[in-house]
């Protein structure tokens, strides 16, 4: 059924003038009337029409707009242009060149023209030239955001919302909307509205005077009288969770104009509402591929999803019921066990991965930046579910990138300088680490990477930036991501006869940047192997973890809780400073006496601080407590013990009582009193990974042997 577009325009005018909402005091608030007044006084440029507001008045008009967006954009713009004089109460103070130009032309025309004379159609001002505002539609809330691969031919010309990640951004350039020409013979002005990406400039003057005199006046382009608008091109790609397994992520070009430019950077997750349109190829490409057409999205509204309307994360507050479900007894163990519940065991590794997802607190004292992100390397024999843990973290993390060592080059991880096909300029295209900004980058087969490519990660792991000096582009990109790497030992399997360095064969500069380096060994053990085999066969039969009293948390709920934890900024109180420094000095002392220990540097202390703040965040606290520091030190000890394997000097293989005894003996000063504070000894034992019960048992055992005495108040341990 043909539409009467004049009547439709009247509907648009009525809506803009009459739509209102009641405020708290019951007064009518004319939402669009206020904005029209701002536009008339040049205080606002972009007018967003919210289709939810229009749906209250006229649902049929909303459907028509979604089906034929381009036409209705012009109808609304014409309606606004006609209404503006009613809202203009005063003269515009700050006028630009185009304002003066248009006013001058109108004045000249009124002076020099006979009232009875009709205006030359070529000299008429096109509406695009007179418009000093931009009009965009905001999609109705009922329309769901689509995936790039779901936008197909049936969406041509319609209003669609697409979600994706920005991979490339061009520079903002002025784009010509109306070309103005002046004739060198008669002085008449001619205007040429431009709708397509290319246009043919007019040469001969079409005015009546030149036609009757046959003077053949030539036209010259007047750039000051022409109208330009800001233009930028984006490339968006599907999110990793939207790509079916084994498929290549799809891309889409987005053309952004006016006030919507400069809103996104490479690596931003965005939701873009716009009109899906085709475009014939032009220039040289038309000769080669003349019958092919390209498609693009003409942007109306661009929203960064990781800042405001992040519907993917579901940032609505957790209800009290959900919070109670998470923060009940042993919630730390429960959250850790909810990570990859199909995988048997690895409790401490899962706890470390949970802390990696939450992250520590960033510090920037006087410009110097101390990172808060936690980096973890999982080293282990083949078949211990390292890659499964990585892929689960990739799915669970709100922002993540998954890549493998052999399949990634140094440029693919950091950033590539590409030649823009439209302008021929060099542009930056972010790599995996840039796209994982404020998220997690999982790198599998880390040991298979080329050494030259691996060096690209050094700067990211400590400074959290990527510095580039390529093809005349000198810049620094943010790469504030946690790195989770999985690697096999140098000989395929871990060889206990070799040292740690010989087995790992990664440079010390890289290893010290990992907060935790975890070795997962596959040792034969009858009871363990039996439980693992039963677990695997059950998972294989039923495609889920075996039934138990423990019910793992839903992935969406965990994601929301992690987002909630990240808002906390816990601080370390001064009372813990001495405790931390003493613990660090002790660790350095152990590293010096034990040659087979891994490298311990000042970064180890920073790692403990990061893990402590992550634990405080997990409890939704604003202050780090001693238990957090003890747990952080326990995880650090456990990761070091995992590297020492079956060696005789490892503390794990000795009896707990013997290790606790040697720990307390080391605390006794060489001269003076041969006693130790009970509380300090207990804290030291707990930080080494022992339970209070084991500590008590060790005290009693050695007291019976008459090695030391514990006083009645249990405040002091004195060596006999």
Curated annotation (Swiss-Prot):
Protein name (Swiss-Prot/TrEMBL): DNA replication licensing factor mcm7
EC number: 3.6.4.12
A biological process term (GO) from this entry: DNA replication initiation
Zinc finger (C4-type): 183-210
Post-translation changes: Ubiquitinated by traip when forks converge following formation of DNA interstrand cross-links. Short ubiquitin chains on mcm7 promote recruitment of DNA glycosylase neil3. If the interstrand cross-link cannot be cleaved by neil3, the ubiquitin chains continue to grow on mcm7, promoting the unloading of the CMG helicase complex by the vcp/p97 ATPase.
Binding site for ATP 1: 344, 383, 385-387, 488
Disulfide bond entries: none
Annotated ranges, domain MCM: 331-537
Reaction(s) the record says it catalyses: ATP + H2O = ADP + phosphate + H(+)
Compartments, record wording: Nucleus; Chromosome
InterPro entries linked: AAA+_ATPase (IPR003593), MCM (IPR031327), MCM7 (IPR008050), MCM_CS (IPR018525), MCM_dom (IPR001208), MCM_lid (IPR041562), MCM_N (IPR027925), MCM_OB (IPR033762)
UniProt-recorded Gene Ontology molecular function terms: ATP binding; ATP hydrolysis activity; DNA binding; DNA helicase activity; zinc ion binding
GO terms under cellular component: chromatin; CMG complex; MCM complex
Keywords: ATP-binding, Cell cycle, Chromosome, DNA replication, DNA-binding, Helicase, Hydrolase, Metal-binding, Nucleotide-binding, Nucleus, Ubl conjugation, Zinc, Zinc-finger
Self-association and partners: Component of the mcm2-7 complex (RLF-M). The complex forms a toroidal hexameric ring with the proposed subunit order mcm2-mcm6-mcm4-mcm7-mcm3-mcm5. The heterodimer of mmcm3/mcm5 interacts with mcm4, mmcm6, mcm7 and weakly with mcm2. The N-terminus is required for interaction with mmcm3, though this interaction may not be direct, and remains in a complex with mmcm3 throughout the cell cycle. Begins to associate with zmcm6 at the neurula stage. Component of the replisome complex. Component of the CMG helicase complex, composed of the mcm2-7 complex, the GINS complex and cdc45.
Other notes: Early fractionation of eukaryotic MCM proteins yielded a variety of dimeric, trimeric and tetrameric complexes with unclear biological significance. Specifically a MCM467 subcomplex is shown to have in vitro helicase activity which is inhibited by the MCM2 subunit. The MCM2-7 hexamer is the proposed physiological active complex.
Keyword NADP: no
Motif Arginine finger: where in chain: 512-515
EC class: hydrolase
Family: Belongs to the MCM family.
UniProt xrefs under PROSITE patterns: MCM_1, MCM_2
Superkingdom field: Eukaryota
Taxonomic source organism: Xenopus tropicalis
Binding positions (ATP 2): 513, 603
Function: Acts as a component of the mcm2-7 complex (mcm complex) which is the putative replicative helicase essential for 'once per cell cycle' DNA replication initiation and elongation in eukaryotic cells. The active ATPase sites in the mcm2-7 ring are formed through the interaction surfaces of two neighboring subunits such that a critical structure of a conserved arginine finger motif is provided in trans relative to the ATP-binding site of the Walker A box of the adjacent subunit. The six ATPase active sites, however, are likely to contribute differentially to the complex helicase activity.
